Amino acid sequence: MAWALKLPLADEVIESGLVQDFDASLSGIGQELGAGAYSMSDVLALPIFKQEESSLPPENENKILPFQYVLCAATSPAVKLHDETLTYLNQGQSYEIRMLDNRKIGELPEINGKLVKSIFRVVFHDRRLQYTEHQQLEGWRWNRPGDRILDIDIPMSVGIIDPRANPTQLNTVEFLWDPSKRTSVFIQVHCISTEFTMRKHGGEKGVPFRVQIDTFKENENGEYTEHLHSASCQIKVFKPKGADRKQKTDREKMEKRTPHEKEKYQPSYETTILTECSPWPEITYVNNAPSPGFNSSHSSFSIGEGNGSPNHQPEPPPPIADNLLPTSTPQEAQQWLHRNRFSTFSRLFRNFSGADLLKLTREDVIQICGPADGIRLFNALKGRMVRPRLTIYVCQESQQLQELQQKHEDGDAVTSTFFVYHAIYLEELTAVELTEKLAQLFSISSQQISQIYKQGPTGIHVLISDEMIQNFQDESCFVLDTMKAETNDSYHIILK
């Protein structure tokens, strides 16, 4: 007797539906993705994932950053998926940047209850302009006397302490803040992007800038030099209300695009998150520079004597050449790259030791870094010095007379006398620079040199001027004669 198990009608319907769903789920295997389907590569290319990409080595990619900086201004919708976000700002308008503490419990306990220092900068985004940044900013200062590129709107800011703006650094501001308290700083950018374009005929595109923030903690000496975190974002600055018009124009252009074209662009975000970057190279090492205004003062007045009075300050040591050594570790090589303004390539060369970098040929570095940076890196690796604008050779007359007299007493021929000259290298070609170089040569203070003369025709004494030095022939030789001044303890020097 055959037994047959019959399912209820409802169970049969459920079983049939499950079979159809399973068949449908298998039917797409081996087929191409249609227009309505998606791939994981497209998902990973979305801006939310792209903005989280780190510019640091892989071992640091998964770490949570201690701080986060958020610029309260919308990003442009006309930026492609794989490009960095771009934010439009109005000239002179105050924009909030929120300083957020992202530390986990127990992270960086040494700054608990203490202040940190943040330095804000507006710098060029284009590498071409970075090379001439000093000249560009000096030109802006000349055209806009009394104005600054970057300012803090102090009345609107919250939680900032001791805000400062160096009068010589128009694009930099700094302040202290407590990470445990709410901190928001309002900044104003006063230059517009079109002020730095090469040709100004109207309608040209403005150059992009970067807002960079470097944060430091206090060291044992009370100086804020230990780097904690750096981040930056790309901006363009327009005349008042120009940023709003540009944002509206970009939005209207995107609305006219097809859905397929829109998928290639990032959506516009209400705020701009600054992404982590390398620290500004000059900041980390700024305190290694000697203090300005330090003058040596010795009482002796002969070349190479070097026995100054103990009551005066010793002569400052010569600057140490920052040459990369073959024995340098990869960590030391990274520090050397940052000090010499090659931070862009620090990740590329993160596993290179000093010997590895020094083995690179000129063609190697040009191929890796491009022509401009490649040549600069090659010259830095080889320690090539810039040729001075003017070189002169000097010898002290008293030494010559002593040697001539000694030769005469010994009965030797005068023509066999050997004189020692000292090289002086001039860059600025000014009388002040020559005075300082001669003071160093004689181991005295530059204030002890009253005047410098050049012996002219018929023995006349011509006062040295900037124009005269600029007309010196390169590698000219001079004999120095010194005379005591009648009024004080200074000296006159005569070039013969």
Curated annotation (Swiss-Prot):
One of its GO terms (molecular function) is RNA polymerase II cis-regulatory region sequence-specific DNA binding. The keyword Transcription applies. GO terms for biological process: mRNA transcription by RNA polymerase II; positive regulation of transcription by RNA polymerase II. Keywords: DNA-binding, Nucleus, Transcription, Transcription regulation. Residues 238-268, 296-327 are annotated as: Disordered. The keyword DNA-binding applies. Pfam families: CP2, GRHL1_C, SAM_3. Residues 61-300 form the Grh/CP2 DB domain. Expressed in the epiblast at the pre-primitive streak stage. At the primitive streak stage, expressed in the extending primitive streak and in the prospective neural plate. At stages 7 and 8, expressed in the neural folds, somites and in the regressing primitive streak. At stage 12, ubiquitously expressed in the whole embryo. Residues 133-386 are annotated as: DNA-binding. It is found in: Nucleus. PROSITE patterns: GRH_CP2_DB (PS51968). One of its GO terms (cellular component) is cytosol. It comes from the Eukaryota. Residues 241-265 have a biased composition (Basic and acidic residues). Binds the B-response element 5'-CAAGTCCAGGCAAGT-3' of the ENS1/ERNI promoter. May be the major transcription activator thus being essential for its expression. Component of the SSP (stage selector protein) complex, which appears to be a heteromer of TFCP2 and 2 copies of NFE4. PANTHER family: ALPHA-GLOBIN TRANSCRIPTION FACTOR CP2 (PTHR11037:SF11), TRANSCRIPTION FACTOR CP2 (PTHR11037). Belongs to the grh/CP2 family. CP2 subfamily. This is Transcription factor CP2.
